[in-house]
Each structure stands twice: as structure tokens, then as C-alpha cells.
């Protein structure tokens, strides 16, 4: 394994490249990011995983967790952000279980090998689509994490279960015939406008790693997401407490609306709230007025 190197976030952060098994597109890596100088005697390790067409840049998350005595790490999954290599299809996997390797590699680098020898417990945190592989991995690795925090998790399709089940055969057929054929863009610009500092949002980030309209999805990737959402729908508990954070409302429109500065523009929060209670035995769901996907609070329009 390589050594920790300076990170694009500046002198306060460093990154570690995690080599993974190559695939048909060549070399595959994931990337772990952390502060260079952690706080004294952390009692908990936190591993954060981003969502679709995203990467870690929200240093406020590290500030929050480390101010509360935790050691924060963020993982750029394969083919995203720091882990995206030339010639790769951004974000592409055909099975969300593929991310088990990324998660395991990150935990091993953090000192969590699953042998009970780590001096600290670990909590997992996922945003949007990033919550799905974490939840699925934890179902296959019970007891490995003390808690799971999901921020605007994409646990159900925007058309809810009925629409997803109708689309599944069509998407599945396309996934078998042309798995990497780009689909139409899913973000027409409203999401970016609500979070980017350039348009009045809170954050500045690299548009090469998080394009204005997002990377194009593929049939195989969407089929994998549908399969993961169906696994959640079956109600398989994960044996750890789960906190789900959602906006109070969604604004799912093809055109810009000032309401997008105060609501979730990516998921159907009502449908996800209903699905969330099937994650386990202890699942508090917080519906936060004015919250946008990614953790921002609105009020500006």
C-alpha cells in the first residue's frame, strides 16, 4: 500500500490510494482522505461515503465529527473523484456488492480488520446513493459497525416501488445488452444550482469530479441500484442503530424553482422516510425543514 500523500483540500488533509482488483477498464483504486493532525484520543472512527457523481470536499463534516471526539475519514469510491482514472466510465459498477472491496480496504487502512483488535468502534455515514452500498455491506458483515448514519439516502426510486418494479425489466434488459451505454442526464441543473457557491449555494468544488449536470448513468449501474433498493424493501435488518436525515420536503421539477434552495431536489423524501424504517430495529428518522441534499440549510432564494 502506498504512503499518505498531500490532498487537494490543502495542507490540513492527506489522502491514501487503496489499490483494488483491476477490471475490464484497467487499474482500479479507491482513495481514503483524512485530516493530517487528528484531535487528541478519539473515541470513535467515522467512515463517510459520498453519493452519485460526487466526491469528498465537505470539510464541515470532518470539523463536526472531530469536534465531537471522533476520527473522521472519507472514501472516494472507485471511478469517482480522486479515484477516477483516464478511460474509466465514471461511477460505473454492475453490482453494488463490488463496493465491498472499497469499504473493506478503507476499514483495514483505518485499523479495522474485523478481528476485534481495534481500540475504537467505527460508525459509517453515507450520502444519497452512497448509503446503499454501506447498508448492503453491513448486512453481509454484521457487527462490523457500531452505527450507520444516512444523509438523504436513495433507498427508493423517485416513482416509489410501483414505478421501480415497472422499470426494472426494461432497465435489466438494457443492462444485459448495452451495460455502459449512457442514459439521459438525470440532473438538469437544479441540484447543482442549489449547492454550488457559484449559483448561491454553499460549496466550491471541482467540476471535473462533480459536473454541473452530473455524470451520465448507465443501464447496468441503474439496474444495480434497483437491486439494492429491492434488498432494502425486503426489510432485512442490519443489527445496528441507524439514523436517517432527510429534508422535510422534496422539489422534483425539470425547471429551476427557489424552493430548491430549501428542499431536496434529488430524492422523494416521503418515500424514503417510509422505506427507512425497514433498515433495522432502531431507526430514528429526522425530517429537517430547510435542509438540502448534502446537508445544507436553505433560506436563500
Question: Residue spans of the language-model regions?
Answer:
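Alpha/beta-hydrolase-fold enzymes
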Residues: 129, 133-216
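Alpha/beta-hydrolase fold nucleophile elbow
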Residues: 113-128
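Alpha/beta-hydrolase active-site loop
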Residues: 92-113
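Serine-hydrolase catalytic core
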Residues: 182-282
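Short, surface-exposed "cap/lid" segments of acyl-processing enzymes
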Residues: 34-77, 84-86
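Catalytic active-site module of serine/aspartate enzymes centered on a nucleophile-bearing elbow/loop
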Residues: 280-301
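N-terminal cap/lid segment of alpha/beta-hydrolase-fold proteins
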Residues: 1-39
Amino acid at each position: 500500500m502506498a504512503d499518505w500523500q498531500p490532498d487537494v483540500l490543502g495542507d490540513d488533509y492527506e489522502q491514501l490510494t487503496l489499490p483494488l482488483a483491476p477490471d475490464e477498464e484497467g487499474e482500479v483504486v479507491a482513495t481514503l482522505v483524512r485530516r493530517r493532525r487528528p484531535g487528541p484520543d478519539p473515541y470513535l472512527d467515522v467512515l463517510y461515503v459520498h453519493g452519485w457523481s460526487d466526491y469528498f470536499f465537505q470539510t464541515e463534516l470532518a470539523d463536526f465529527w472531530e469536534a465531537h471526539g471522533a476520527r473522521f475519514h472519507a472514501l472516494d469510491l472507485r471511478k469517482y473523484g480522486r479515484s477516477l482514472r483516464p478511460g474509466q466510465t465514471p461511477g460505473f459498477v454492475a453490482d453494488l456488492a463490488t463496493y465491498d472491496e472499497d469499504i473493506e480496504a478503507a476499514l483495514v487502512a483505518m485499523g479495522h480488520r474485523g478481528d476485534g483488535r481495534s481500540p475504537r468502534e467505527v460508525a459509517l455515514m453515507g450520502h444519497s446513493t452512497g448509503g446503499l452500498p454501506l447498508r448492503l455491506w453491513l448486512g453481509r458483515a454484521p457487527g462490523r459497525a457500531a452505527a450507520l448514519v444516512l444523509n438523504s439516502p436513495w433507498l427508493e426510486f423517485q416513482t416509489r416501488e410501483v414505478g421501480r418494479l415497472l422499470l426494472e425489466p426494461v432497465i435489466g434488459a438494457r443492462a444485459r445488452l448495452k451495460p455502459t451505454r449512457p442514459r439521459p442526464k438525470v440532473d438538469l441543473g437544479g441540484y447543482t444550482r442549489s449547492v454550488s457557491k457559484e449559483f448561491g449555494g454553499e460549496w466550491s468544488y471541482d467540476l471535473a469530479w462533480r459536473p454541473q449536470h452530473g455524470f451520465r448513468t448507465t443501464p447496468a449501474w441503474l439496474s444495480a441500484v434497483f437491486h439494492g433498493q429491492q434488498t432494502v424493501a425486503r426489510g432485512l435488518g442490519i443489527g445496528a442503530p441507524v439514523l436517517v436525515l432527510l429534508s422535510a420536503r422534496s422539489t422534483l421539477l425539470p425547471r429551476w424553482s427557489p424552493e430548491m434552495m430549501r428542499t431536496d431536489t434529488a430524492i422523494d423524501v416521503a418515500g424514503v422516510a417510509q422505506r427507512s424504517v425497514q433498515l433495522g430495529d432502531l431507526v430514528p428518522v429526522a425530517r429537517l425543514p430547510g435542509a438540502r441534499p448534502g446537508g445544507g440549510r436553505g433560506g436563500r432564494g
